[in-house]
Curated annotation (Swiss-Prot):
Keywords: DNA-binding, Metal-binding, Nickel, Transcription, Transcription regulation
A single GO BP: response to nickel cation
HAMAP family, A to Z: NikR
InterPro entries (UniProt xref): Acetolactate_synth/TF_NikR_C, ACT-like_dom_sf, Arc_rbn_hlx_hlx, CopG, CopG/NikR_regulator, Ni_resp_reg_NikR, Ribbon_hlx_hlx, TF_NikR_Ni-bd_C
Family of this protein: Belongs to the transcriptional regulatory CopG/NikR family.
NCBIfam families xrefs: PRK00630.1, PRK01002.1, PRK02967.1, PRK04460.1
Source domain of life: Archaea
Entry binding sites for Ni(2+): H78, H89, H91, C97
Protein name from the UniProt record: Putative nickel-responsive regulator
UniProt cofactor note: Binds 1 nickel ion per subunit.
Cofactor(s) recorded in Swiss-Prot or TrEMBL: Ni(2+)
Any one GO molecular-function label of the UniProt entry: nickel cation binding
Amino acid sequence: MELIRFSISIPSKLLEKFDQIIEEIGYENRSEAIRDLIRDFIIRHEWEVGNEEVAGTITIVYNHDEGDVVKALLDLQHEYLDEIISSLHVHMDEHNCLEVIVVKGEAKKIKMIADKLLSLKGVKHGKLVMTSTGKELV
């Protein structure tokens, strides 16, 4: 992979804060941190456009005693077999469950599936976390 050197102008206090944070995180150098930021910027743009294939997780916490939430969750997961790769179910206590659903597919469709799951009655909290499949990243 060919590397290109370029320069940027940045306020000194912003750079000082950036250097402090990347040192705390453990980056070996500024260049690797900048590369990660650029990759993240590209991935977020792909989500907004919605055409690119993404991977991610939909994490939800729900009360399994409330209504038909368990049946609705299972029905939705079976409806999207091509996009839902796997799921992990954890009993948090006697009433609450945590479900982590691994997904892969077109960004728009993954967002739509997450919206459907997160809006189910009985779901207390949830979050979609998307990332790249890695195919297009350098």
